[in-house]
């Protein structure tokens, strides 16, 4: 994983090697993902099997800290790089620096691993000849264990993943892309909230040894589902009050043929949405503008109504690349000017950002993250026997975080573009967290008193 991260900083640009550039980037990201697939389950299992009974939640919570602390450190490195190099240089080539510097961490990681020995539980299992000869078959080919794997996914890690991603990554996306805060300011605000919230991973890990893993994780999912809408609306008012005021004073409506409007789900960022409806909605969604939808007769071009002004979009289907780019630029310039005259800011005014309030809201969102994530490693370890523990716990964890969590920003943006409501994408984490809470409360067993060596 460390080597693939370093290589990302060395990749040629699209101008140099064309389509091979994004292909190489995706390949390196796949290598990172495959590496992480082996990292987390092994780390959680190793630490839990070394921890004394009654302290596994506390011990494994330090693993959970590393993900958020790593994000915090990455934000600090990005902030420093931006400050030292300047924004233009950072966008041009400075973004490579953090990836290149990561090679130093690879050396530290290798040194640590060379000092480790097998856990007592695993070594005893090997000595007694009780290890699984076919861990994949034993984990996923036998219903009694497969049932637990599925339950761990839908009743535990899926909800944990969307709460984790919403509290740490979607907030970054929402502040910078939707509310249009300055990138450096966004990184600083989120980094501050992460720093304040990080000790709570350990607190909730310790508390789970006292009252159980299940109530803390389920409560985190429930609180997130109940409060995301008011918290993100409050975040808008605190971070970009001009945008909040413009939405109230100059409502926007998109009048379009429903058949002309696509669901703009684009996980790799390469799909070209070129219908008049898609061009209108895509720009508004990226500008953080809330709008209502109104159906138009079939075959008509989409229109955007801003207060008393109406702008008609163009149809980019069938246009040559250069012509499409020119018309798109002209369209977006005109739409941007109309929004500006109606009071919609192109960027958030940093002087108007209520920093303490923003940090307070972000901190609360991070607390939800610590509730669902702090105790989860211990609980996953305790759900499976030693001979298939590593394999069995890794699948629900990574499917939950990779699929349910990883697709959150893309799915949320597509939902926002489809409906015109900048908060509508929150329904995705709310629904997933709610389903996890219901299934987890009804069917998950408490595991804190399980003897994992038995």
Positions of PLM-derived features:
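Cytoplasmic membrane-interface "Motif A"-like loop-to-helix N-cap segments
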Residues: 1, 210-221
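C-terminal ends and interior cores of transmembrane alpha-helices
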Residues: 1-18, 222-242, 334, 338-350
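Hydrophobic core of transmembrane alpha-helices in multi-pass small-molecule transporters
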Residues: 11-37, 242-256, 352-371
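Loop-to-transmembrane helix entry
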Residues: 23, 178-195, 356-360, 423-427
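Glycine-rich segments within core transmembrane alpha-helices of 12-TM secondary carriers
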Residues: 35, 57-82, 105, 231, ...
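Multi-pass alpha-helical transporter architecture, strongest
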Residues: 109-116, 228-238, 431-454
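Flexible cytoplasmic inter-helical loops of multi-pass small-molecule transporters
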Residues: 114-136, 453-454
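Extracytoplasmic gate region of multi-pass secondary transporters
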Residues: 145-194, 231-232, 259-294, 298-299, ...
């Amino acid at each position: 994983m460390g080597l693939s991260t370093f290589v990302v900083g060395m990749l040629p640009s699209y101008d140099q090697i064309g389509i091979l550039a994004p292909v190489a980037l995706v390949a390196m990201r796949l290598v990172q993902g495959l590496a992480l697939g082996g990292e987390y389950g092994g780390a959680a299992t190793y630490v839990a099997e070394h921890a004394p009974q009654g302290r596994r939640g506390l011990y494994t919570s330090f693993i959970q800290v590393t993900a958020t602390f790593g994000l915090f450190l990455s934000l600090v490195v990005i902030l420093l790089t931006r400050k030292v190099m300047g924004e233009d240089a950072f966008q041009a080539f400075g973004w490579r620096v953090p990836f290149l510097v990561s090679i130093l961490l690879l050396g530290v990681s290798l040194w640590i691993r060379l000092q480790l020995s097998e856990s007592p539980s695993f070594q005893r299992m090997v000595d007694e000849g009780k290890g699984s000869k076919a861990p994949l078959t034993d984990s996923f080919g036998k219903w009694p264990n497969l049932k637990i794997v599925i339950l761990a996914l839908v009743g535990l890690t899926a909800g944990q993943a969307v709460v984790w991603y919403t509290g740490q990554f979607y907030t970054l996306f929402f502040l910078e892309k939707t509310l249009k805060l300055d990138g450096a300011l966004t990184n600083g605000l989120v980094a501050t909230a992460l720093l304040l919230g990080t000790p709570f991973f350990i607190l909730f890990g310790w508390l789970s040894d006292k009252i159980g893993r299940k109530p803390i994780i389920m409560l985190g999912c429930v609180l997130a589902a109940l409060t995301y809408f008011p918290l993100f609306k409050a975040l808008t008012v605190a971070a970009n009050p001009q945008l909040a005021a413009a939405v109230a004073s100059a409502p926007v409506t998109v009048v379009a043929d429903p058949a002309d409007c696509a669901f703009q789900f684009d996980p790799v960022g390469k799909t070209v949405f070129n219908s008049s409806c898609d061009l209108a909605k895509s720009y508004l969604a990226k500008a953080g503008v809330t709008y209502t939808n109104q159906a138009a007769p079939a075959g008509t071009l989409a229109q955007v109504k801003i207060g008393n002004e109406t702008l008609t979009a163009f149809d980019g289907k069938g246009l040559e690349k250069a012509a499409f780019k020119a018309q798109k630029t002209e369209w977006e310039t005109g739409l941007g000017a109309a929004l500006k005259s109606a009071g919609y800011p192109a960027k958030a005014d940093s002087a108007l950002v209520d920093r303490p309030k923003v940090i307070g809201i972000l901190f609360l969102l991070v607390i939800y993250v610590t509730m669902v994530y702090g105790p989860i490693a211990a609980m996953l370890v305790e759900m499976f026997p030693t001979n298939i523990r590593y394999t069995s716990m890794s699948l629900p964890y990574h499917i939950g975080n990779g699929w349910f969590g990883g697709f959150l920003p893309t799915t949320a943006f597509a939902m926002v573009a489809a409906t015109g409501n900048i908060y509508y994408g929150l329904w995705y984490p709310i629904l997933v967290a709610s389903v996890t809470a219901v299934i987890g409360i009804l069917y998950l067993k408490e595991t804190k008193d399980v003897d994992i060596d038995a």
